[in-house]
Design a protein with these regions (language model features):
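P-loop NTP-binding core
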Residues: 1-288
Length: 288
């Protein structure tokens, strides 16, 4: 059974999509079978994996959640390349899922049940969650074994974290123990700038841990602000493949390529730390 990990923060602009896709690529390159699920109507993860989103798509997460579509009918290949990792795309229609789900019985368990037939095909299923606490995000949390909370390096990064912790504790306390084993795997700081502002955010998070007993710990790996992360997303790919695309025929190009490889290396380090935290300490095989 694949380990299901949601990248979750009810705030936007914290690097959820970038972290989900690049972590998936890092794990895939280590030899793990990976499925990404884009649970955000903005569809940034889907776009990074080469999908053009429109309302005419009929095999997406929206149909899984609201129309009873089987998960394996909505699985695509990253960049449509053989041997790449898989994904289930989002759709603009996913915005309608909140109202559609509100009247459905067992609405919070739809994704969990839909993934059961395919989970044995993957080592990891990574979910890119929307910046909201609605039914779609609840489905992601109920389907997950672990949560990773990306936080940007701004001083107020932990504002609103209390709502995530509250929802997490509510799920853990549900009758019939529907997902009592859910864990917060950790908090990863992204978009880190050189000015050191993230130290304030780290201190604030440490205070909340001590004062309120928040679960989870901060990942040692930090994702530095890097122009290549924005550029790779704009070119609808991950930073690993983007770095490979860049020419190295002169000093400027070689320097740019090296900059992009630094970002890729940070996500590789994050993937390794994830493996350690979930008890899978060594890559099973390298695709390189």
């Amino acid at each position: 059974m694949g380990k299901v990990i949601s990248f979750l923060n009810f705030k936007g602009g914290v690097g959820k999509s970038t972290s989900t896709v690049n972590t998936a690529k890092a794990l895939h390159d280590m030899g793990y079978q990976v499925l990404v699920i884009d649970a955000d109507a903005q569809g940034n993860s889907s776009k990074m994996m080469g999908k053009k989103l429109n309302d005419n798509l009929t095999e997406t997460l929206y149909e899984i959640l609201t129309k009873g579509l089987e998960a394996d009918e909505a699985i695509y290949l990253d960049q449509e390349k053989e041997g790449s990792f898989n994904y289930i795309p989002s759709s603009p229609k996913l915005d309608n899922a909140e109202s559609d789900l509100s009247s459905m019985v067992g609405r919070e368990f739809i994704l969990k049940n839909a993934l059961k037939p395919v989970s044995q095909d993957y080592d990891f299923i990574l979910i890119d969650c929307a910046p909201s606490s609605g039914w779609v995000s609840m489905n992601a949390m109920m389907a997950s074994d672990y949560l990773i909370v990306p936080l940007n390096g701004e001083p107020f990064a932990v504002d609103g974290m209390g709502k995530i912790i509250q929802r997490y504790k509510e799920i853990k306390a549900l009758k019939n123990n529907f997902n009592e084993d859910l864990q917060i795997l950790g908090y990863v700081f992204t978009l880190i700038r050189k000015c050191g502002l993230h130290d304030d955010a780290k201190a604030a998070l440490a205070t909340q841990h001590e004062k309120y007993g928040w679960p989870g710990s901060i990942f040692n790996t930090e994702i530095k602000q890097n122009v290549c992360l924005a550029e790779s997303g704009a070119r609808r790919t991950n930073v690993f493949d983007y770095a490979e695309m860049l020419p190295d025929n002169n000093f400027m190009n070689r320097n740019k390529k090296a900059t992009c490889m630094k970002a890729a290396e940070q996500y590789k380090e994050l993937a390794m730390e994830i493996l350690q935290r979930v008890g899978m300490r060594q890559p099973i095989e390298s695709n390189e």
